[in-house]
Amino acid sequence: MMANILGAGVYSDIFFVAFKLPNLFRRIFAEGSFSQSFLPSFIRSSIKGSFASLVGLIFCIVLFMWCLLVALNPLWLAKLLAYGFDEETLKLCAPIVAINFWYLLLVFITTFLGALLQYKHSFFASAYSASLLNVCMILALLISKEKTHLEALYYLSYGVLLGGVAQILLHFYPLVKLGLLNLLWKGFLSFKTKNAAKKKYRSKRIKRDLKGFFKQFLPSVLGNSSAQIASFLDTTIASFLASGSVSYLYYANRVFQLPLALFAIAISTALFPSIAIALKNNQQDLILQRLQKAWFFLVGVLLLCSIGGIMLSKEITELLFERGQFSPKDTLITSQVFSLYLLGLLPFGLTKLFSLWLYAKLEQKKAAKISLISLFLGLAASLSLMPLLGVLGLALANSLSGLFLFVLTIKAFGFQLFLGIIKNLKSWLVILFLACVEILLLLAFKSWVTHLYLFYYFQGF
């Protein structure tokens, strides 16, 4: 829908730049950076209501002040996000940045409420909240279909905010039902107690809990979000390239994220509690056994996705995006970017698996260090390849960054343990067989489609 109305040009670039930072936070929070640091601290806290309400209040105040600062003067952030845009484009971009930036506050509230629901093993609201954002954005695009591109940008931006509000509202019913809203309210009221002894005890416990939470939070964010930050930096660099480059990266990355989220992130999220418990009980053999099963499953699935995606990149892009303002030229470039992104699917996905070991051992600082090194190496690759390959160089550099991240994570995990996990000839032969079958089937399918197209073309259909 977005490709149909905005295409891949200056207006789509403006929106993707404006939405990039809020979307970065959405993806970081959604992939567990907040929950992995908040939930352990929340579970250990003896004053859960006070701790949760204070964490929520601190984040909301800080984010509100940032949003207000950007709303009052959005041009500086627009320049920071897209330094390569000319002055006229930056002036168009600034108010769109100001509107979209408020989504940061909304997405934090959604994530915070979702983390509380996870404590009660309630996942429905978190699972479906993302779809509400998409629904609101689609409705905004439908309403603005007959408007100018600039007007459509404003409709779409307000659609993002409406989606954020809808995401928050979706969480309220389960929060009330499970008594969590009442817990937050009581926690907030507890700060008004006049009992000096209780106040001193609560203050001491809160300081300890907050220190533990923030000690884990920042490294967890850095360690979990190297792919997202790399993509964010690529957007800024792409603003120096030809019009449409930011859009090509965005459209290709959206499709690339699908198998990563469906398989790698989902499996690592589900596996984390059992790995943490087994590590606590010194059951290393059990951990390695589970990691081995997950390894071969992910290698098989992600390899098949990569092969299929690369071989059908043009067809996938054409099917998803080529209509309205999205031209065949846009399809060609986006499909090439998508293919280069897919080269990094295996390393990025498998890194998610082995980083569980570091987080279960509470080595968030080591994970953050690895993430920063891979980011710097990826940034160097982007700056080196961009003059030669343009937007394609940025996509290739992103995949190289994933490879750096994977190698460094395996080094931290231990090469001997890693070699023990991947020793299974039977599993490798099965994966190789499936990959060969997929390649042959896709070649036959593409040949059949080509012959069918030529037949109907010469028949005059």
Swiss-Prot record:
Membrane topology annotation: Multi-pass membrane protein
Primary localization: membrane
Single GO term (MF): lipid-linked peptidoglycan transporter activity
Pfam families hit by this protein: MurJ (PF03023)
Pathway: Cell wall biogenesis; peptidoglycan biosynthesis
Transmembrane segments: 5-25, 51-71, 96-116, 123-143, 156-176, 229-249, 258-278, 293-313, 337-357, 372-392, 402-422, 429-449
Cited function: Involved in peptidoglycan biosynthesis. Transports lipid-linked peptidoglycan precursors from the inner to the outer leaflet of the cytoplasmic membrane.
Protein name per UniProt: Probable lipid II flippase MurJ
Species in which this protein is naturally found: Helicobacter pylori (strain ATCC 700392 / 26695) (Campylobacter pylori)
Organism placement in taxonomy: Bacteria, Pseudomonadati, Campylobacterota, Epsilonproteobacteria, Campylobacterales
